[in-house]
Amino acid sequence: MSGASVKVAVRVRPFNSRETSKESKCIIQMQGNSTSIINPKNPKEAPKSFSFDYSYWSHTSPEDPCFASQNRVYNDIGKEMLLHAFEGYNVCIFAYGQTGAGKSYTMMGKQEESQAGIIPQLCEELFEKINDNCNEEMSYSVEVSYMEIYCERVRDLLNPKNKGNLRVREHPLLGPYVEDLSKLAVTSYTDIADLMDAGNKARTVAATNMNETSSRSHAVFTIVFTQKKQDPETNLSTEKVSKISLVDLAGSERADSTGAKGTRLKEGANINKSLTTLGKVISALAEVDNCTSKSKKKKKTDFIPYRDSVLTWLLRENLGGNSRTAMVAALSPADINYDETLSTLRYADRAKQIKCNAVINEDPNAKLVRELKEEVTRLKDLLRAQGLGDIIDIDPLIDDYSGSGGKYLKDFQNNKHRYLLASENQRPGNFSTASMGSLTSSPSSCSLNSQVGLTSVTSIQERIMSTPGGEEAIERLKESEKIIAELNETWEEKLRKTEAIRMEREALLAEMGVAIREDGGTLGVFSPKKTPHLVNLNEDPLMSECLLYYIKDGITRVGQADAERRQDIVLSGAHIKEEHCLFRSERSNTGEVIVTLEPCERSETYVNGKRVAHPVQLRSGNRIIMGKNHVFRFNHPEQARAEREKTPSAETPSEPVDWTFAQRELLEKQGIDMKQEMEKRLQEMEILYKKEKEEADLLLEQQRLDYESKLQALQRQVETRSLAAETTEEEEEEEEVPWTQHEFELAQWAFRKWKSHQFTSLRDLLWGNAVYLKEANAISVELKKKVQFQFVLLTDTLYSPVPPELLPSEMEKTHEDRPFPRTVVAVEVQDLKNGATHYWSLDKLKQRLDLMREMYDRAGEVASSAQDDSETTMTGSDPFYDRFHWFKLVGSSPIFHGCVNERLADRTPSPTFSTADSDITELADEQQDAMEDFDDEAFVDDTGSDAGTEEGSELFSDGHDPFYDRSPWFILVGRAFVYLSNLLYPVPLIHRVAIVSEKGEVRGFLRVAVQAIAADEEAPDYGSGIRQSGTAKISFDNEYFNQSDFSSAAMTRSGLSLEELRIVEGQGQSSEVISPPEEVNRMNDLDLKSGTLLDGKMVMEGFSEEIGNHLKLGSAFTFRVTVLQASGILPEYADIFCQFNFLHRHDEAFSTEPLKNNGRGSPLGFYHVQNIAVEVTESFVDYIKTKPIVFEVFGHYQQHPLHLQGQDLNSPPQPSRRFFPPPMPLSKPVPATKLNTMNKTTLGQSMSKYDLLVWFEISELEPTGEYIPAVVDHTAGLPCQGTFLLHQGIQRRITVTIIHEKGSELHWKDVRELVVGRIRNKPEVDEAAVDAVLSLNIISAKSLKAAHSSSRTFYRFEAVWDSSLHNSLLLNRVTPYGEKIYMTLSAYLELDHCIQPAVITKDVCMVFYSRDAKISPPRSLRNLFGSGYSKSPDSNRVTGIYELSLCKMADTGSPGMQRRRRKVLDTSVAYVRGEENLAGWRPRGDSLILEHQWELEKLELLHEVEKTRHFLLLRERLGDSVPKSLSDSLSPSLSSGTLSTSTSISSQISTTTFESAITPSESSGYDSADVESLVDREKELATKCLQLLTHTFNREFSQVHGSISDCKLSDISPIGRDPSVSSFSSSTLTPSSTCPSLVDSRSSSMDQKTPEANSRASSPCQEFEQFQIVPTVETPYLARAGKNEFLNLVPDIEEVRAGSVVSKKGYLHFKEPLSSNWAKHFVVVRRPYVFIYNSDKDPVERGIINLSTAQVEYSEDQQAMVKTPNTFAVCTKHRGVLLQALNDKDMNDWLYAFNPLLAGTIRSKLSRRCPSQPKY
């Protein structure tokens, strides 16, 4: 035994054409036996070096001295291995490497002698040595086999009969071998070369990106070399058998490198599997050999995975076994193949560590035969032991073992199947005994022959099948005897077998029509010299004459492969018959071969362009066309040679006889002239074109005449009306209408109300001035001014006072007449240079814009020496800059509905006082002087000669740059307000008030103490701060006080008059809840009676008796205001100080000292004490009773966000989270493509409204052929939202289902169009982006059939959506992680009696995954451990809520009304010079108005919080001794403050009810039952509330037909597979606007059982429920209207976004229709909608109820009658629902969520009925 390592050599080839075209660089270096590789991605990295036995440099040309040729490689490796083979060792050489690296070249080489590879050189030298060493004592025999491993299957390359895949088996003695693999005996190198060439042509090759002829299989060429030596002395012969395995591996590759797809990719996967397994085997063998452990035990890790692939299984002996092995690793030098080359080097480095234990194979046949005979004997003994001895008793004297086992087992296999059938039928089959003849005739089966009469084959097989292990033993016996027969085969028999196989191969090839040389040499297609034949002609010249078909002697048939008789030439095609034609080849008397073409019946066969129906004799060169596509040329070599001899001067035809020639000949012979046909067709098209053009011109002329006549008629009509109008105006004089006082009040109320609406006027200002804003920004960018402009809305409130320069002059004149401040449009100027923000009026912007234009025009004249270093100096009056407030306002406190005095317009502190003896006055004066000095020094105006100015700024003679204004040092941080009502009693209070900025942001807190003191009381010593030694005197003059702006009635009015609310259009109360003028007048009268302010006058009746003695009119009163601490102010504001003043005396401010603010540690301690003395007047008492004092906090702003982040121009200010709009904004409808342009119709009166619940589904095509809804991600948790999870590149459909209550006015007629567009990756829609709109094909649109009594309508339509037509990358690719795709779809639906379609628009969110991805819906944390409802298929949809209004078309009105309705042009789209430099910036539009309204609402809520906090603090301090004056003075103020401009009346009532429910005895001062003590106004209010609470609804329908709820919340499926229409619908109680009483419901439907006993979960059903019909009592609009009015309805659909605030959620029981059962469903109240789900895990809304149009009823009498507790009803216009809660408390909670007013009424009744019980 000899142990040696595997010899490893590496060889690098030259660049191929692909690498040369890509200009690749060489990364391989070789020096001696060392090989290095350089990383092209990181050249600085040290090269990786490897050491091998041989390193061959074949990258250069042969002229290079270092070049390694084929001969050198063979001399180093091949000769050594051949020497080992002669010594008797097994030898293996295999090449490894990536595809195209040169493995096949190294192993096989090329045809040239100098290019031969290792295999041919080794074979050639093998026979040379045999010939040299052959003598009488030595004899040699060589056998070869050639197999291919393709896709893990083994194929024989030498035997054409072995077309199938061969089995790989393993024998205990032989090891792994290939069953039935041909082993052919050869006697010379020529035989091997022929076999090798034949096998190579049969190999599987294909082209990849890396190699044009890539080997797609592993080839193993095996040579069995036997040496026999006869010893003359002993007359004994010995044998040496060597097995030479030469392996050409397929290329290792990567799919992305080779570009493999389809079959190539599958092949590559199997190739990589084999090579990966080979690498694992190499690594495992290397680890085993390197193990130095002394332990001899086999470890678990020593397992070698030979069986993981066929390749390693067959090469097991060559890898680490009995073999001498050499490995050649082929390398690519190109840098583009770095990864593959490095992998090959690493494998080779591992392979050189493998140890092989090779032994000399001496006389293996004799040993093997002996062992096999022992194995046969053992198997026979085993069969005898099992009782089968009579089967295998064979006389050994008759013959040897050849064939007996095989014959018997063949019979056994043939009869096995019939035996099993016979066994199943329990009857023995009469098997044919013909096979027994073969058994008896077998030389080794005489014993079995003697028992034929006793035993049949059937009985033998039955015994074998019934014996355990018998079949396996027979199979192994067959295997062993086959090997014995093969080993005993003589050399002569092997040669005969080889010759037979060669003959069969040649016959098979000749049968296929492929010619072979007469000497039987190399295969190829040759032009025959004698035999007639056909060659193909193809349209592609490169494909012509590539096929050759022999015309054999006799008959050669042509037809299809599936013909009854075998066809010699097989063709395929549409016009090829099964038996198409035949060629008859016969020899004439003269010896000439004549070929005749005989077409079959109805076959299309053409010869030289003529169709033949009878036999035709063919001449050489004839063109034959079979069918339509198969073109051939007939060649007769002998006939052509004879013709050339007869006419040697025959000219060569000028045109080649090819496919084109044959086709043209066919057309000519058929009478078809292509040129004439084309001319004729062209003439026909010209005639058609002229005809259509004449028709179009005629139609256009007719249309022009029609338009002209219509224009003339309209002109005459306008002239006639204008003349009549002028005549009427001249003749008629307007008479004064005699109005009554009541009518005048109504008109005044309406005028003041509608004058308050500013939405349209603000929008017009924004649109009309947008062009100026854009131009200013463009000039700023051009001149490199660091200024940005944007629109902003300002409202004059206490928190955000508007400077007087921003108020228009006409507004100042009418300022006192308004009950509340107006909103103005201003320009926000962001000074990025100084970090300041200024506000300009529109007039100021236009003035500055003129200067900017002038500066821009003269900018080119500026000297080049002017430097832009104005950063070092402060700017002057640049039009782009305003003065910067270094002390910035942080915040302020409550807001009032009344106007704010103009004194708050001054933003800089001006501490002046009315008394001259105050020390603080002197200190304040000093501070003011210092500030003025600082201001003069720091903010010096820039002059025109200053070099530090911006470009062009020195052009103005006054030295003012129009881009800049002066900036102050201080910025207002915020404001806070403190009420003084505690001075009425008097009690000291310490307030902690919020410092609120102008944007409603809380910037900190301020602690202020207010108390009444004696005139000579000393202030406490706080240790720091300023303690005033004097007392400031403030006067409250009644006359001056009443004339002030701030004393508007809106500040103290406690009524519910809507005219006193600040209204920005669209934010006020809805039309359904607006109080009529009579109510308003009645409330105004109540205001007069209650003693509140009205038109600036105070009614003080009875007040003097309630105030204390310390506030007697005319007396002196002193109180103290102490500013204690400030906390929570950001550290960006330094040098914090505070000043405060009274509202009517803004010029008298009291200031503290500035304090350093570091933002950490203890609060800032001002401890500023100010004593204030006043003379008590009615104005003073009213002031401390209802009004606060204002505190303003200033600071030096150190950090400027504008410097740090350069805010985006188009980023709007973000409102608070509470009022922020929904995450996905509502989009405008996508324009229709098939419909005419829809004009925006002015809507008139709304005739009816419907709530639409719409389901959106996207279905994808499944492998089953069905469209299944795609998975929807509902993890966001918000209603009406979800993300579709789609697969890439799959056909889809969009399904839309509309659900609504039945109505006579609403009938869906058809779907006009469904369009999709606006593909984007963000929720916001870029209006400027141009996106292709795709109109989808509607495949179905129908109303889903429901029961005739159902109160809900289901309308569904479906469209085909091919997302590839958008040509959008977002839809075609897989969506990156974290990104979402948004798309807008709009459905245009036609309704009956409507003049234009209704439009439903929805923004859809999507995420695309790969085609094969397994998509499952994400599960929220709540459902992590439970079964999520989203697994249900009907959960894969997204819902939308819409409100449909059917309105009458508004009358156009008079010309004056039309002028007032004119639409202001949006100038934001107008082009200005330099606009392209703004990088997509756009002026703010309508959204700015909504955001500003949200800010005002937040400020108002902050105001209410501070006011309520003061009231509660004072009441807590007073305890139980709350005087009546407190409730009289503060309660109305608080109640008035609860009115909000955006809250509904229901929310107001609920707030009032809540406040009244909190200890009414403490808050009002009287007991709830003591009605006699109420004042007149409170009596009036109580009476009104009582009327509302006890209002009796329409009860004319005493009998309710049907139950309360007519639908289960189950899935209703009109389609068998998809329960898609799961809904919530209810039976119609009455269509009237009022809900009938539920007390008179049928007792049969109201079972006495509780819902808990009868409740059941909803389940999907296949049919709609049967509902009861209720007569309609209200005549619908269409029934009342005339026929002409039917066409005047205009549909208006608006999407409604549900609120994010959940009032209540939980389970409720719903009464089921026509039964006594109750269904349990999950309900979520998000006002104003109630969402109904199947369960708490159901993500899809199944039903909705609009609480704003519904009526909630609760009756104890009803519950007593039906004996069902805790029930209440919800009635809409068309239906009613009966609900039941779990218990009393749960029912009260639900009632409060549904209707707070009703819940408050119930609580009041319970509290009066059971006063001792706690209130709900």
UniProtKB/Swiss-Prot annotation:
GO BP term, example: neuron-neuron synaptic transmission
InterPro entries membership: FHA_dom, Kinesin-like, Kinesin-like_KIF1-typ, Kinesin_assoc, Kinesin_motor_CS, Kinesin_motor_dom, Kinesin_motor_dom_sf, P-loop_NTPase
Gene Ontology CC annotations of this record: axon cytoplasm; cytoplasmic vesicle; microtubule; mitochondrion; neuron projection; postsynapse; presynapse; synaptic vesicle membrane
Parts forming coiled coils: 365-386, 470-502, 668-737, 841-869
Organism domain of life: Eukaryota
Main enzyme class: isomerase
Ranges annotated as biased composition (Low complexity): 1525-1553, 1620-1637
UniProt-annotated stretches for the region Interaction with KIFBP: 270-350
Domain FHA per the UniProt entry, residue ranges: 556-612
Residues annotated with Phosphothreonine modification: T647, T652
CDD domains: FHA_KIF1B, KISc_KIF1A_KIF1B, PH_KIFIA_KIFIB
Modification Phosphoserine, positions: S1054, S1057, S1416, S1454, S1487, S1573, S1603, S1610, S1613
UniProt cross-references to SUPFAM superfamilies, sorted A to Z: P-loop containing nucleoside triphosphate hydrolases, PH domain-like, SMAD/FHA domain
GO MF term (any one): ATP binding
Entry binding sites for ATP: G97, Q98, T99, G100, A101, G102, K103, S104
Effect of disrupting the coding gene: Knockout pups were delivered in normal Mendelian ratios but displayed multiple neurological abnormalities and died within minutes after birth. They display an overall reduction of motosensory neural function. The cellularity, organization, and development of the brain stem nuclei and commissural fibers are significantly affected.
Subunit structure: Monomer. Interacts with KIFBP; positively regulates KIF1B microtubule motor activity. Interacts (via C-terminus end of the kinesin-motor domain) with CHP1; the interaction occurs in a calcium-dependent manner.
Family that this chain belongs to: Belongs to the TRAFAC class myosin-kinesin ATPase superfamily. Kinesin family. Unc-104 subfamily.
The protein's name in its UniProt record: Kinesin-like protein KIF1B
